[in-house]
Amino acid sequence: MNKTEILLSCMFLNDSEEMIKRSHITSDTIIINQCDEDGYKEEHIGSAFVRTFSVKERGLTKSRNLAISESVADVCIICDDDEVFSQGYEEAVQKAYSSLPQADIIIFDMAGRPHKWGDSIKKLGYRDIMSVSSWQITFRREKLLAKGIRFDENMGAGSGNGAEEEFRFLTQCRKAGLKIYHYPYELATVAQTQSTWFKGFDREFFVNRGNTTRYIMGLPLSVLYAAYYAFAKRKQLTDISMFKAFSYTLAGIKENRLYKLNKGNN
């Protein structure tokens, strides 16, 4: 049986017991609490053995990576502080991995959100993973470690470079030969809380979008995607035109900030 562990990222957590109970967590959990002090504690909350790491550093992807490095599980479940897990989720995840021994990463459904692949078990390709959110992601930890894959710390909430860190993470997994599958089970419900990074479709959003898409896709595909994305979002744009959105995205593609950051860190 695959041992599972939830990797929960949060900020300024005061009561870990309340968090665990509110989220209906019943399995072992690592909490990365980004706050203003460093600390560590262990506690048993119901059936869950919970290890909480309090750290001063900021950034969602840094939180994810710390949790991965501290985990001792076979299978890890990515989690934020606004999720409520379905009853029996741990057994469902274990069943999914037992029935798909070839899967290195399994993407689950979220209650109240579109089920893109219906009730089918499906191996996911490049286009499929573009719409995956972090809450849906589970993975075999040892497979990730063996390939040296982590979340890109230049991306995600707190980085100043926008989001799409899940897409970057999954594309790196695919490039490394890891197999990604969808399994039809509603893992959790996600609250409709305000995003920590999305402030609307403004200039900053589209410039960041251009930077991230070029970083992940490369130059030719990112330009094509910029045109598609501006057109797809045209009805949601209130303060800028579709053509402005496209031009801002192109500005981000030209800036190529993330590539330069990554190159400077290596």
Locate predicted features:
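Conserved donor NDP-sugar-binding/catalytic core segment of glycosyltransferases
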Residues: 84, 88-121
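N-proximal low-complexity "stem/linker" segments adjacent to membrane-targeting elements
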Residues: 1-28
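Non-catalytic, C-terminal membrane-associated alpha-helical segments of glycosyltransferases
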Residues: 200-266
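Active-site donor/metal-binding and catalytic loop motifs
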Residues: 157-161, 179-200, 209-212
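A short, conserved alpha-helix in the catalytic core of glycosyltransferases
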Residues: 143, 154-183
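A recurrent flexible, glycine/aromatic-enriched loop bordering the glycosyltransferase active site
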Residues: 122-143, 160-162
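Glycine-rich, basic loop-to-helix element that forms the pyrophosphate-binding segment
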Residues: 54-71
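Short aromatic/hydrophobic "clamp" motif used to bind/position activated sugar donors
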Residues: 76
